[in-house]
UniProtKB/Swiss-Prot annotation:
The protein's name in its UniProt record: Myosin regulatory light chain 1
The organism of origin for this protein: Caenorhabditis elegans
Keyword Repeat: yes
SUPFAM superfamilies xrefs: EF-hand (SSF47473)
Compositionally skewed regions (Basic residues) per UniProt: 1-13
InterPro entries associated with the record: EF-hand-dom_pair, EF_Hand_1_Ca_BS, EF_hand_dom, Myosin_RLC
GO molecular function: calcium ion binding; myosin heavy chain binding
Biological process (GO), any one: regulation of muscle contraction
A GO CC term attached to the entry: cytoplasm
């Protein structure tokens, strides 16, 4: 097989992206899937995503929800969910992943979210919420908050590297 043919064949969707995860990670994805599958029917659909956003105090436009659903080749069961994440996370910078998650709450698309929204996100009762002590510990790390808004790109950098000083020189 030629080098070009090998390269081309490696880009095909194999469905084996999920094989890259260890059991602990798969369990974490199961928990996340369970949170997203609001009606507990084993399929994440438009209604589930709308309910998930609503539970976080957000209203997602239908176009955004439809775009998410279209990323899957069919109904989003756990296997499809895991495959989608496998495709997304292959070669993805964890910092970029965190930024993408926070960007969902950036209503103004300005790189910042309200501090109150950050606390709501971190203390959301779905998933693994932070308790008061964990939130206090987060503040000891001096998150980039100014005027009641969090620079979530800088915060993601702080989370992934622990280095706030590097931001000033970047």
């Amino acid at each position: 097989m030629s080098k070009a043919a090998k390269k081309k064949s490696s880009k095909k969707r194999s469905g084996s992206e999920a094989a890259q995860f260890d059991q602990k990670t798969i369990q974490e994805f199961k928990e996340a899937f369970g949170i997203m599958d609001q009606n507990k029917d084993g399929i994440i659909d438009k209604s589930d995503l709308k309910d998930l956003y609503a539970s976080m105090g957000q209203i997602a436009p239908d176009s955004q929800i439809d775009a998410m659903i279209k990323e899957a080749s069919g109904p989003i069961n756990f296997t499809v969910f895991l495959t989608l994440f496998g495709e997304r996370l292959t070669g993805t910078d964890p910092e970029a992943t965190i930024i993408g998650a926070f960007a969902m709450f950036d209503k103004k698309d300005c790189g910042k979210i309200k501090e109150d929204d950050l606390i709501k996100i971190l203390q959301n009762k779905r998933g693994e919420p932070l308790d008061e002590d964990e939130v206090k510990a987060m503040y000891k790390g001096k998150p980039p908050i100014e005027g009641g808004e969090v620079d979530y790109k800088a915060f993601a950098h702080l989370i992934t590297t622990g280095a706030q000083d590097e931001l000033a020189s970047a």
